């Protein structure tokens, strides 16, 4: 059994990166491996935007990540600098930056690159999408 860390750099919609990462995560968990952390970086931070509203016949990837994380104890870390540049923030950062609202999907955590470094060091495999 291997411990994995995923890095997602593509948005929830518009490219295949995030969807492929989600499917990969499901597959490795089904095979008995462990997924300790998913780090969302660059455009990948858009996976944490709770204001996405996919069509009724589309898979809701944002909420899919949260459900997967709850079921398997996975940390969903979002790069705070990349998130703020792209308009994704939690209540605390919104207040610090003087922004009118927050939109970070509950279940995701704003964090720095240090959390990615820690996850990379403690996992057996790091896979980037």
Swiss-Prot record:
Gene3D superfamilies: DsrEFH-like. One of its GO terms (cellular component) is sulfurtransferase complex. It comes from the Bacteria. The keyword Calcium does not apply. GO terms for molecular function: sulfur carrier activity; sulfurtransferase activity. Its EC number is 2.8.1.-. It is found in: Cytoplasm. GO terms for biological process: tRNA wobble position uridine thiolation. InterPro entries: DsrEFH-like, Sulphur_relay_DsrE/F-like, Sulphur_relay_TusD/DsrE. The active site is at residue 79. It holds the Pfam family DsrE. The keyword tRNA processing applies. Keywords: Cytoplasm, Transferase, tRNA processing. SUPFAM superfamilies: DsrEFH-like. NCBIfam families: PRK00207.1, sulf_tusD_dsrE. Belongs to the DsrE/TusD family. Part of a sulfur-relay system required for 2-thiolation of 5-methylaminomethyl-2-thiouridine (mnm(5)s(2)U) at tRNA wobble positions. Accepts sulfur from TusA and transfers it in turn to TusE. Heterohexamer, formed by a dimer of trimers. The hexameric TusBCD complex contains 2 copies each of TusB, TusC and TusD. The TusBCD complex interacts with TusE. This is Sulfurtransferase TusD. The gene is tusD.
């Amino acid at each position: 059994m291997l411990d994995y860390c995923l890095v997602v750099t593509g948005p929830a919609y518009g490219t295949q990166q995030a969807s492929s990462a989600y499917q990969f995560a499901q597959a490795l968990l089904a095979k008995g491996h462990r997924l300790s952390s998913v780090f969302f970086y660059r455009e990948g931070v858009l996976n944490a935007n709770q204001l996405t509203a996919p069509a009724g016949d589309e898979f809701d990837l944002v909420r899919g990540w949260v459900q997967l994380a709850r079921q398997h104890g996975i940390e969903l870390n979002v790069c705070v600098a990349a998130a703020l540049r792209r308009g994704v923030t939690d209540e605390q950062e919104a207040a610090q930056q003087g922004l009118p609202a927050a939109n970070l999907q509950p279940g995701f955590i704003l964090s720095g690159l240090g959390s990615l470094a820690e996850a990379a060091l403690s996992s057996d495999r790091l896979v980037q999408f």
